[in-house]
Amino acid sequence: MTHCCSPCCQPTCCRTTCWKPTTVTTCSSTPCCQPSCCVSSCCQPCCHPTCCQNTCCRTTCCQPTCVTSCCQPSCCSTPCCQPICCGSSCCGQTSCGSSCCQPSSCAPIYCRRTCYHPTSVYLPGCLNQSCGSSCCQPCCRPACCETTCCRTTCFQPTCVTSCCQPACC
């Protein structure tokens, strides 16, 4: 590990969102790392709300794995637990819920709780198709690195073509 987001007291990732920091020994006060089930000794956690680091740990996967590309649901090994999804043919659900396991075979299906139009008019519910140019997809928390996305945390959602960060709003 070469870098940890502040605060950090060791190169081995001493921070509140570090996963499985078994080698941290010199934290200043209370233990500043929390254990989890990441496969490596200390995965660099995703910097919410987006993760585009060289190494990160997908917290939205059923089995968190370290990946080397921008963190998207497709990075996870199947099945991948997405925070919001709706695919009756894949998940066995007919409506959007808080979470559901969607196999990678369902990748072409995009379904979100809210889909934003460029005019900021929103359509509640799910769309069983890709939004395309007429509708921006909301960011998939905790990461969003889609080609086109719509910041759901903005008062006026706008389409951006780069990784979704607060500065995009």
Curated annotation (Swiss-Prot):
Keywords: Keratin, Repeat. Coiled coil: none annotated. InterPro entries: KAP. Sequence repeats lie at residues 8-12, 13-17, 32-36, 37-41, 46-50, 51-55, 56-60, 61-65, 75-79, 80-84, 85-89, 90-94, 100-104, 139-143, 144-148, 149-153, 163-167. One of its GO terms (cellular component) is keratin filament. The keyword Secreted does not apply. Residues 8-167 are annotated as: 17 X 5 AA repeats of C-C-[VGSREQH]-[SQTPN]-[STPAI]. In the hair cortex, hair keratin intermediate filaments are embedded in an interfilamentous matrix, consisting of hair keratin-associated proteins (KRTAP), which are essential for the formation of a rigid and resistant hair shaft through their extensive disulfide bond cross-linking with abundant cysteine residues of hair keratins. The matrix proteins include the high-sulfur and high-glycine-tyrosine keratins. Belongs to the KRTAP type 9 family. Interacts with hair keratins. This is Keratin-associated protein 9-7. It comes from Homo sapiens. The lineage of its organism: Eukaryota, Metazoa, Chordata, Craniata, Vertebrata.
